């Protein structure tokens, strides 16, 4: 029987995160610096929200109700309703749930503490590696 990959093999462990009071411009700079699209938002030691690059882009768009982008902080725009899963949840269950709910990220918790984040980007990278391993010979010149 083959091994079911665990969420820990796919997720981004110890993700970059921000406090609720972090200015959006700073959050956007962190996303660029770390090449990520989602940031867990913390209120002390608790995850209180999830901020995405799309949320920030929307706030920067003309006609957005919050016109003064420079005054906004992560807590103003983060989604307060977000999916979180336990570190020991099977990967297939998490991915199925993400697909059914149309989620592009879930927060991964261990003992009520932030342990990681699993995004569609993480899943695609993992699946790509798996496909190459399963279906391409080791001597394939197309493998980088």
Give each language-model segment a name.
Residues 1-14, 52-84, 88-99, 114, ...:
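Tandem CBS (Bateman) regulatory domains
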Residues 31-34, 39-55, 98, 106-122:
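A glycine-centered beta-loop-beta connector
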Residues 17-35, 42, 84-102, 108-110, ...:
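The conserved cystathionine-beta-synthase
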Residues 73, 104-105:
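C-terminal basic regulatory modules in eukaryotic proteins
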């Amino acid at each position: 029987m083959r091994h079911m990959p665990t969420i820990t093999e796919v997720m981004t462990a110890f993700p970059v995160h921000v406090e609720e009071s972090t200015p959006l411009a700073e959050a956007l700079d962190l996303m660029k610096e770390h090449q990520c699209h989602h940031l867990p938002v913390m209120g002390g030691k608790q995850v209180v929200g999830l901020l995405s690059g799309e949320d920030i882009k929307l706030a920067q768009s003309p006609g957005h109700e919050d016109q003064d982008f420079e005054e906004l902080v992560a807590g103003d725009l983060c989604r307060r309703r977000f999916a979180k899963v336990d570190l020991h949840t099977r990967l297939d269950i998490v991915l199925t749930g993400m697909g059914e709910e149309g989620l592009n990220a879930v927060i991964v918790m261990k003992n009520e503490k932030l342990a990681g984040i699993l995004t569609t980007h993480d899943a695609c990278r993992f699946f790509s590696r798996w496909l190459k391993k399963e279906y391409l010979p080791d001597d394939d010149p197309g493998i980088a």
